[in-house]
């Protein structure tokens, strides 16, 4: 076998590598789904609060849980695109993004359909869906900056305030968090 492919690996070594990649892939999907669910809880909590500051604070607990648990959230990874850790792993970003989007939307959609809690976010979603491309881009860049500050700040300081404050800023400024936006769309019952 090794001679056929011009390498010195044994079949058992190749199978171990393949199995390790399969495990890594399944962990990526699981961590991405859990991250989407945690952000979904943040969305639900945020729009359930009458006080926007309290809602923004409680939303930050979703990202805090994602970071503490080491889950895979697209918006926490994309800021590191130029780093060696992420370079060449575009497929992980794409898979993570889709798993985040599907899980946050599904949780919020099901919550809106089966919960007795009345959630009003149609105005928020309508505003986001009707904003111009330049507005959306500026708001997305603002969110990306806040997410990078949160994730990178926590990795360097281990201080929860470095997560909480940037998240509160992006929520209170109305920045566009692509994963959270899907949660809000799900809460409105949109497909």
Model-based region annotation:
Residues 18-191:
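Alpha-helical transmembrane segments and their helix-helix packing motifs
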Residues 11:
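Cationic, low-complexity basic patches in intrinsically disordered or flexible, solvent-exposed regions
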Residues 2-3:
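Ala/Thr-enriched low-complexity intrinsically disordered regions
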